[in-house]
Swiss-Prot record:
Displays ATPase and GTPase activities. Transmembrane segments: none annotated. This is Nucleotide-binding protein Tfu_2020. The lineage of its organism: Bacteria, Bacillati, Actinomycetota, Actinomycetes, Streptosporangiales. Gene3D superfamilies: P-loop containing nucleotide triphosphate hydrolases. Belongs to the RapZ-like family.
Amino acid sequence: MATSRGDDLLPEIVVVTGMSGAGRSTAARALEDLDWFVVDNLPPALLPTMIDLAARTRGAVPQIAAVVDVRSMAFTEDLLSTVEDLRSRGIGARVVFLEASDETLVRRFESVRRPHPLQGDGRLTDGISRERELLRSIRGEADLVVDTSQLNVHQLKAKMVGFFGKARETRLRANVVSFGYKHGLPVDADLVLDCRFLPNPHWVPELRPLTGQDEPVRDYVLAQRGAKEMLDSYTEVLRLLVSGYQREGKHYMTLAVGCTGGKHRSVAMSEQLAARLRDEGVEVNIIHRDLGRE
């Protein structure tokens, strides 16, 4: 929660730092999914300025996560003094330190074929050792130390949700997008449903000017052979997906529902599927991408 202080609302602060390759970016994405305002590679000295700017929004930015990449002793000292100063002002600043074993870090860097940022012309292990020494004092002052050696991406995200999330924030959110195949598939779809096997209301004169949001079109589409069976079958599939996505720490999914033009069948069926997803506890946003695009 943001802290009230005079006329201002001071945000809650989390500083995410630690060893390169230990999962800072993954932790930051998890916080972003929890609606934290995430700032990457922020110099520690600028953190108080960021907090003051957030306070002027009067609560619009209640939580800030600053990802700090400490690559020099000067940055290390800046971070420690900045956190100490914030705490002396009564601002709840917590430091999360991510680490992993040397063996794990070597394996991760080798898998992506990238040098360690402090490696220079030396060996990978030299860079890891140098960084570990630079960060020793920060690790000692951290509020939370997370060893990611045995964690995969999903498990680390789940840990961050456990530390900083609320029950309502862990619900899956779904975009249900109706579209017309003649305009192209949505590029971000996790699952695509094809409604073109259903008779097209376009060929019914009194339905042609209407859309799938209109009751006559909806009733016509749902009355067709196979429509209810399709909805029931995909509801079961979506139930499995929702459970699996939540178990793996996925917070968003995009379900695309297509017909020829994106005006009748896909619109009606996407509305029905969205309602069923809501019944499963999913937060749903409906987008009729090609509606009105003749």
